């Protein structure tokens, strides 16, 4: 089974998709004139200062936290470990490249989600790639929108949303705390069921409280590991850069890797982690209270920066400096080994708390993504059966094999990204026009303030 899945994975994540994925990011980067570089300070400032005076279901901060809840997950811990184990330290460099260009992609897809969102008779907002494909490209492209929604449900059910997260939670609780898989599975299923029944506002409320806390906890812990291994950090960075462009030889428990394998592992796991181009984040971005589509695009873009440029970088570096990537361990066990090397007394507990929170919030976020895709395909009546099915799959997750889960996740991720990337390229002119209009609005607004002050002074 694993061999068949690996062959499918190699085909899906072959050169064509990698070129389309990174190529879309490069195209948008240049069409937007390096917006992810020059507008990043503005984007970071908007996280807390956005006015939230437009129509929407949740404020911009909660929308970002819900997206981060789904984004910052096991991909940041276990995913980075499996990428480095498969492709060597060079995989981290390709994660950086995917994230850099992915920031322009995330900005564009979330902008389009707000621009083409729809409002029903009850005032409920729906949006995401399926809507900007159908409403932006035209009705004749609806099959492409349906294709995205179908793969979105599969991704929530069998990819990022359930199996990968649940399996990581039960593995780390068993390793760190000795809790049997069955008990963890039951507890997780009950808690997920309780929160998901409440819908977006319930999920967003939990995310707004948990995500900032868990990100700060993980950041401080990993910085602590960097301090413990401070003398090895320069060499680790050199290893990452060298391994990105030259094959990595086999050593210890590491089997060796080609440059192509490092690139494929890094980009695939990078997309799994930050979800840029996947089309998931736009689904919740569409629900944000904002007047300007470009404003929510900027706020959403910071998610990729936080997720990969900060969190994944720290994870990758502590795995390299600690040397555990050369050992026989993989996945959560590999990261747990690095944590306990730095903090023998409490390292495993810190990782346990961080990983459980990361994975749990990812499950909640992806439940919502899948729900919106099901609603697009079959209407509101299909939501309850979808939720029941989701909860059942969460209960099944603990009993599947790690390797098969991650390969399966890669496959459905790639298939989900394909229709979204096609739409992003086709609608890139709309993104550029909306961006220019928003920046012109800000310029005019900033010019009005001194004029008003001068007028008040004269009177």
Predicted regions: what they are:
Residues 29, 107-117, 121, 223-239, ...:
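Extracellular/periplasmic helix-exit of transmembrane alpha-helices
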Residues 1-74, 84-91, 102, 395, ...:
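N-terminal alpha-helical transmembrane segments of multi-pass membrane transport
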Residues 24, 28-29, 101-123, 130, ...:
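Helix-loop-helix module between adjacent transmembrane segments
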Residues 9-42, 85-123, 144, 306-312, ...:
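Extracellular loop-to-transmembrane helix junctions
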Residues 34-60, 82-84, 88-92, 96, ...:
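Flexible loop linkers connecting adjacent transmembrane helices
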Residues 20-27, 31-44, 166-173, 180-241, ...:
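Membrane-interface loop-to-helix entry segments
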Residues 17, 31-36, 75-80, 89, ...:
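Transmembrane helix-loop junctions in multi-pass membrane proteins
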Residues 54-86, 112-136, 147-150, 154, ...:
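Alpha-helical membrane segments and immediately flanking helix-loop junctions
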